[in-house]
């Protein structure tokens, strides 16, 4: 070891403690030690506390600000290099791990969780000692450091907050409406006081009879449930036994003769249920037995939906659950109950067990948007509270809402033994409960956790081709399937089981592993165990049976802590008929950019393995091959958080941070894949293309092929790669539809006389609810500037030039023949003549026109606003003075330039309209422009933001604010081609049309815009065609070749993006 290594090694046990700034989650405000804990540790002296210094990384969001730590003697610094022990709450970023240090945090690695193995690898490679809070267990067998009660407390407060809003939408005003979310209160005491106030109002004013009885059902009896019940008990309440629930619904409903409720209810009801209330034995002669249920859940039927759910208003889910147990409430059960008019209002899933015991809770929610609505009638998810369905909450970081109290509780316990960790130089120095919590020591796994590599190596997902040296059990003469359930990992029973197998001379292979997701949850594993001698296999079974059923002959060191359940099954033998092994071709795609377009592209590529077995896929890519294509997708973004959010819920997609200006990082990731799909701004494509040429990787973009990229054609060709550009919607699908129509005409010996194309990204009719009938899905500046570009096209042989300032005035009414309900207009889109060259029709077509679509009336209003000066991008004198003015004052400045009194206020539509008329516009035009100006808020007496230096800036600011899509609104894409074909021999003229109409959709709570789909999916199809080697042309190309556009259009249709074609 070099001298620097010796210096690093000396840090361990030096008594200097570091506290990390939490960076993984924006809401994480907890801290392992509060200033008061630090004060006691520092002022107690190193001889007594084991701590000489505490260095705190600065954090503006931590619940206790830096100055409070500094006041008690802590040092504030980003540099923790002097620290031998570093504390956090959640896992730190990998680059924050310093070598030869001790770390303590919740690592979530001891069950070999796949997603956290890179963290463990980093820990081991940096020779770090890791103590996991989750594994610090007291003599009673329970965790010492946990936040369960705080999750329960915050969870129920948050749900009551949402319950008030939901009831109001359903037509009932309740005291819950005044309650805020947990994080809105300065302390737990303040939140409790607010709940008490709600309770007092219920006790004195009552609740509407129409929502009563209001029954809260709590699952489980652990700390989470106790915390939630603690909040519930602040309300006037009565607890009811599960068997008594039906009685609440048969009492006098208090309905008068005219059918109106005449009574109020002055309390709420609670019911605590455990597993015995959720299931019953399949054998009617047998009663519920908890031990039997945990060992053999298959012997029991679920009954919660029959006995409890019909009487539940709010289900507060606090219990652990495993996949081998029946669902508490399935989607089908909820749908059946809904038809019967059940009273279920909402699910408060504090466990945040996604797709777990409550099947339809399909995603975690955020503290600042904690709710979603599931409508079982149409199996749809919504982000609002309006409409039918069940309100669901599943926040996974609830304790941080009471960060002050949670941190105090945590630090009270941690400060009792942090000194031992800070002064530890040898693991043997630690007390037993801390020693058992150390997953690694100086970069080596401790003996209790040596099973982790074994689990990783035998996990088919992680190492399908790298089974451990013992060999797969199916290679042995005698084989069995052993099912183990219990606290296999946190109680280290898995070590004993694997040791027994190996000690007897057997082998094992992990066939299945389902990890318990909480301290109380059990884990479940299936091991294929093999031996070449039947007696050896019998010995293994006997040993495992004794481990599962300890007695005087065999006492497990952990017998008191837990038992495991054991089942023996059959493994397919060598002489049995086996299915032909599936052959898979592995490919990789790197997607650069994590914007809206990325998700549908990533989703398509990640689903290739599934769709490659479908008939249409075999048709396009070859039915003879037995191989399935499996595409591993890497999504790279400058901000890792964006990439992670974009790919959430898509399997086999990896999110990474990548700055394309960092050539080393770009080379690293491009080298790992077969195709790069760049969804970055066009200005970034050249640098990406050069890297692809260097590494001989194909590239796909959805952007126009610019001059810089075109110049790379020969280099790309020499490298044997394809750079496929313009593979989106416009450009993209428009090219492909056009080339198919034109090529079909030429094959039939026809001559294209006229080619016209119209395309627009629009709000759906329901979302076109403003004077412009238009909305922006991103900053409107680009769209407005596009409306000022000059245009050129050919009409009946004449070349028509349109100046940018007259573009909106040139708009003409337009109707799609097959879609007459859409009242549209179009204006020319830049230079249409270049498309005559691209499509090979420049000499034969007398009309070549490409237009942009908008709803009718848009252009007249935009032209008027432009003439009035609302799009003036030069610095405005009033805005540049530094004096803050209101939008109303700015409006007066714009419209009163030529008036005698420039400061004349313009309050309403009528006054604004009159002023516009005075400026030379017609009455109709003025009225519509005035309506738009008022809608945008230009007449409001609020200050113009200081960042607005021009009227154009102010207009864009208001348009972005007022013309944005709300959560449930759909956008729409409409693309329409018309081609007139003349057949010289027959002297007939045919008109061919092709139309694409696509709407955005909401699926599993995720909104995907039509624009994102129609740009992202074609780009992904381009990548797939290159992966499957269906594009043979090399160099820079557009989708103008039949080898691209024919399969691409067919795949688009097979994937659900429909094209309507017609000939007359």
Curated annotation (Swiss-Prot):
<dbReference type="InterPro" id="IPR007698">
    <property type="entry name" value="AlaDH/PNT_NAD(H)-bd"/>
</dbReference>
<keyword id="KW-0520">NAD</keyword>
<dbReference type="Pfam" id="PF05222">
    <property type="entry name" value="AlaDh_PNT_N"/>
</dbReference>
<comment type="similarity">
    <text>In the C-terminal section; belongs to the saccharopine dehydrogenase family.</text>
</comment>
<feature type="modified residue" description="Phosphoserine">
    <location>
        <position position="458"/>
    </location>
</feature>
<keyword id="KW-0511">Multifunctional enzyme</keyword>
<feature type="binding site">
    <location>
        <begin position="703"/>
        <end position="704"/>
    </location>
    <ligand>
        <name>L-saccharopine</name>
    </ligand>
</feature>
<dbReference type="GO" id="GO:0005737">
    <property type="term" value="C:cytoplasm"/>
</dbReference>
<comment type="similarity">
    <text>In the N-terminal section; belongs to the AlaDH/PNT family.</text>
</comment>
<keyword id="KW-0560">Oxidoreductase</keyword>
<dbReference type="InterPro" id="IPR007886">
    <property type="entry name" value="AlaDH/PNT_N"/>
</dbReference>
<comment type="pathway">
    <text>Amino-acid degradation; L-lysine degradation via saccharopine pathway; glutaryl-CoA from L-lysine: step 2/6.</text>
</comment>
<feature type="region of interest" description="Saccharopine dehydrogenase">
    <location>
        <begin position="583"/>
        <end position="1064"/>
    </location>
</feature>
<dbReference type="Pfam" id="PF04455">
    <property type="entry name" value="Saccharop_dh_N"/>
</dbReference>
<dbReference type="InterPro" id="IPR051168">
    <property type="entry name" value="AASS"/>
</dbReference>
<dbReference type="InterPro" id="IPR032095">
    <property type="entry name" value="Sacchrp_dh-like_C"/>
</dbReference>
<feature type="binding site">
    <location>
        <position position="830"/>
    </location>
    <ligand>
        <name>L-saccharopine</name>
    </ligand>
</feature>
<keyword id="KW-0521">NADP</keyword>
<feature type="binding site">
    <location>
        <position position="730"/>
    </location>
    <ligand>
        <name>L-saccharopine</name>
    </ligand>
</feature>
<feature type="region of interest" description="Lysine-ketoglutarate reductase">
    <location>
        <begin position="24"/>
        <end position="445"/>
    </location>
</feature>
<dbReference type="InterPro" id="IPR005097">
    <property type="entry name" value="Sacchrp_dh_NADP-bd"/>
</dbReference>
<keyword id="KW-0963">Cytoplasm</keyword>
<dbReference type="Pfam" id="PF03435">
    <property type="entry name" value="Sacchrp_dh_NADP"/>
</dbReference>
<feature type="binding site">
    <location>
        <begin position="852"/>
        <end position="854"/>
    </location>
    <ligand>
        <name>L-saccharopine</name>
    </ligand>
</feature>
<dbReference type="GO" id="GO:0047131">
    <property type="term" value="F:saccharopine dehydrogenase (NAD+, L-glutamate-forming) activity"/>
</dbReference>
<dbReference type="GO" id="GO:0033512">
    <property type="term" value="P:L-lysine catabolic process to acetyl-CoA via saccharopine"/>
</dbReference>
<feature type="binding site">
    <location>
        <begin position="729"/>
        <end position="731"/>
    </location>
    <ligand>
        <name>NADP(+)</name>
    </ligand>
</feature>
<comment type="pathway">
    <text>Amino-acid degradation; L-lysine degradation via saccharopine pathway; glutaryl-CoA from L-lysine: step 1/6.</text>
</comment>
<comment type="subunit">
    <text>Homodimer.</text>
</comment>
<comment type="function">
    <text>Bifunctional enzyme that catalyzes the first two steps in lysine degradation. The N-terminal and the C-terminal contain lysine-oxoglutarate reductase and saccharopine dehydrogenase activity, respectively. Negatively regulates free Lys accumulation in seeds.</text>
</comment>
<dbReference type="InterPro" id="IPR036291">
    <property type="entry name" value="NAD(P)-bd_dom_sf"/>
</dbReference>
<dbReference type="InterPro" id="IPR007545">
    <property type="entry name" value="LOR/SDH_bifunc_enz_cons_dom"/>
</dbReference>
<feature type="modified residue" description="Phosphothreonine">
    <location>
        <position position="238"/>
    </location>
</feature>
<keyword id="KW-0597">Phosphoprotein</keyword>
<dbReference type="InterPro" id="IPR043009">
    <property type="entry name" value="LOR/SDH_bifunc_enz_cons_dom_sf"/>
</dbReference>
<dbReference type="Pfam" id="PF16653">
    <property type="entry name" value="Sacchrp_dh_C"/>
</dbReference>
<protein>
    <recommendedName>
        <fullName>Alpha-aminoadipic semialdehyde synthase</fullName>
        <ecNumber>1.5.1.8</ecNumber>
        <ecNumber>1.5.1.9</ecNumber>
    </recommendedName>
</protein>
<dbReference type="GO" id="GO:0047130">
    <property type="term" value="F:saccharopine dehydrogenase (NADP+, L-lysine-forming) activity"/>
</dbReference>
């Amino acid at each position: 070891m070099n001298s620097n290594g010796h210096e690093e090694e000396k840090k361990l046990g030096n008594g200097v403690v570091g506290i990390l700034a939490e960076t993984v989650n924006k809401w994480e405000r907890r801290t392992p030690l509060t200033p008061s804990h630090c004060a006691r540790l520092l002022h107690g002296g190193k001889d007594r506390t084991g701590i000489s210094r505490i260095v705190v990384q600065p954090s503006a969001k931590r619940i206790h600000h830096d100055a409070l730590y500094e006041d008690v003697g802590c040092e504030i610094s980003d540099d923790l290099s002097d620290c031998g022990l570093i504390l956090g709450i959640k896992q730190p970023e990998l680059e924050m791990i310093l070598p030869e240090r001790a770390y303590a945090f919740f690592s979530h690695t001891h069950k070999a969780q796949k997603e956290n193995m890179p963290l463990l690898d980093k820990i081991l490679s940096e020779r770090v000692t890791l103590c996991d809070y989750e594994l610090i267990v007291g003599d009673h067998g329970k965790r010492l450091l946990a936040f369960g009660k705080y999750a329960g407390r915050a969870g129920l407060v948050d749900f009551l907050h949402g319950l008030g809003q939901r009831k109001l939408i359903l037509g009932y005003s309740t005291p819950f409406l005044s309650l805020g979310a947990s994080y809105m209160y300065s302390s737990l005491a303040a939140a409790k006081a607010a709940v008490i106030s709600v309770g007092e109002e219920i006790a004195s004013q009552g609740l509407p009879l129409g929502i009563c009885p209001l029954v809260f059902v709590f699952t489980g009896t652990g700390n989470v449930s106790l915390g939630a019940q603690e909040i519930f008990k602040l309300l006037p309440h009565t607890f009811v036994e599960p068997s008594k629930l039906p009685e609440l619904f048969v009492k006098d409903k208090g309905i008068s003769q005219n059918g109106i409720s005449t009574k109020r209810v002055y309390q709420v009801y609670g019911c605590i249920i455990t597993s015995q209330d959720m299931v019953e034995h399949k054998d009617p002669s047998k009663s519920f037995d908890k031990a039997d249920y945990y060992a053999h859940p298959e012997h029991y039927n679920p009954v919660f939906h029959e006995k409890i759910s019909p009487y539940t208003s709010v289900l507060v889910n606090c219990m652990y659950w495993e996949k081998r147990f029946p669902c508490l409430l399935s989607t089908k059960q909820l749908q059946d109950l809904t038809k019967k008019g059940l009273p279920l209002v909402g699910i408060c899933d504090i466990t945040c067990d996604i797709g777990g015991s409550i099947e339809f809770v399909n995603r975690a929610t955020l503290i600042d948007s904690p709710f979603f609505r599931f409508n079982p009638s149409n199996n749809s998810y919504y982000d609002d509270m309006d409409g039918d369905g069940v309100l669901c909450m599943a926040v996974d970081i609830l304790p941080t809402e009471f960060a002050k109290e949670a941190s105090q509780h945590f630090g009270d316990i941690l400060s009792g033994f942090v000194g031992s960790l800070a002064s530890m130089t040898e693991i043997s120095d630690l007390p037993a409960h801390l020693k058992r919590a150390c997953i690694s020591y100086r970069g080596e796994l401790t003996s209790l956790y040596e099973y982790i590599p074994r689990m990783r190596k035998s996990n088919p997902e992680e190492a399908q081709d790298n089974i451990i040296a013992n060999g797969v059990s199916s290679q042995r003469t005698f084989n069995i399937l052993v099912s183990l359930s219990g606290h296999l990992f946190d109680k280290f029973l898995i070590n004993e089981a694997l040791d027994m197998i190996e000690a007897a001379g057997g082998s094992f292979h992990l066939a299945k592993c389902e990890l318990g997701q909480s301290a109380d949850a059990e884990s479940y594993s299936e091991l294929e165990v093999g031996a070449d001698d039947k007696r050896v296999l019998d010995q293994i079974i006997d040993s495992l049976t004794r481990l599962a059923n300890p007695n005087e002959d065999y006492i497990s060191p952990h017998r008191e802590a837990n038992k495991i359940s054991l089942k023996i099954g059959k493994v397919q033998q060598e002489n049995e008929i086996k299915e032909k092994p599936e052959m898979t071709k592995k490919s990789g795609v790197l997607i650069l950019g994590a914007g809206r377009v990325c998700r549908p592209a990533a989703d398509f590529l990640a689903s290739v393995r599934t769709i490659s077995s479908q008939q249409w896929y075999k048709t396009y890519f070859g039915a003879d091959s037995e191989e399935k294509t499996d595409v591993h997708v890497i999504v790279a973004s400058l901000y890792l958080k964006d990439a992670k959010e974009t790919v959430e819920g898509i399997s086999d997609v990896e999110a990474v941070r990548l700055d394309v200006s960092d050539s080393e990082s770009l080379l690293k990731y491009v080298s790992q894949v077969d195709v790069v799909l760049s969804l970055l701004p066009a200005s970034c494509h050249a640098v990406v293309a050069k890297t692809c040429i260097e590494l001989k990787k194909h590239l796909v973009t959805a952007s126009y092929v610019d001059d810089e990229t075109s110049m790379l054609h020969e280099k790309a060709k020499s490298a044997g790669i394809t750079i496929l550009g313009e593979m989106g919607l416009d450009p993209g699908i428009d090219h492909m539809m056009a080339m198919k129509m034109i090529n079909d005409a030429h094959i039939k010996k026809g001559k294209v006389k006229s080619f016209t194309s119209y395309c627009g990204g629009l709000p759906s009719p329901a979302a076109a609810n403003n004077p412009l009938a238009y909305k922006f899905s991103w900053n409107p500046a680009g769209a407005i500037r596009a409306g000022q570009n000059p245009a050129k096209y050919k009409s009946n042989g004449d070349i028509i030039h349109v100046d940018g300032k007259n573009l909106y005035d040139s708009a003409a009414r337009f109707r799609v023949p097959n879609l007459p309900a859409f009242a549209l207009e179009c204006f020319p889109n830049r230079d249409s003549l270049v498309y005559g060259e691209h499509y090979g029709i420049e000499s034969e077509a007398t009309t070549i026109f490409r237009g942009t679509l908008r709803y009718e009336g848009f252009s007249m209003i935009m032209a008027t606003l432009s003439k009035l000066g609302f799009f003036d991008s030069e610095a405005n004198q009033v805005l540049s003075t530094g004096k803050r003015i209101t939008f109303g004052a700015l409006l007066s400045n714009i419209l009163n330039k030529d008036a005698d009194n420039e400061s004349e206020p313009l309050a309403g539509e009528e006054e604004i309209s009159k002023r516009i008329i005075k400026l030379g516009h017609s009455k109709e035009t003025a009225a519509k422009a005035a309506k738009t100006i008022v809608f945008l808020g230009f007449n409001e007496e609020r200050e113009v933001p200081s960042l607005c230096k021009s009227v154009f800036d102010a207009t864009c600011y208001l348009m972005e604010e007022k013309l944005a899509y709300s959560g449930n609104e759909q956008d729409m894409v409409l693309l329409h081609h018309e081609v007139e074909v003349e057949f010289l021999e027959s002297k007939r003229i045919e008109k061919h049309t092709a139309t694409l109409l696509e709407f955005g959709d909401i699926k599993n709570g995720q909104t995907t815009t039509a624009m994102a789909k129609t740009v992202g999916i074609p780009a992904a199809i381009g990548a797939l065609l290159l992966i499957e080697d269906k594009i043979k042309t090399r160099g820079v190309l557009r989708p103008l070749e039949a080898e691209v556009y024919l399969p691409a259009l067919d795949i688009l249709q097979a994937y659900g993006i429909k094209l309507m074609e017609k000939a007359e």
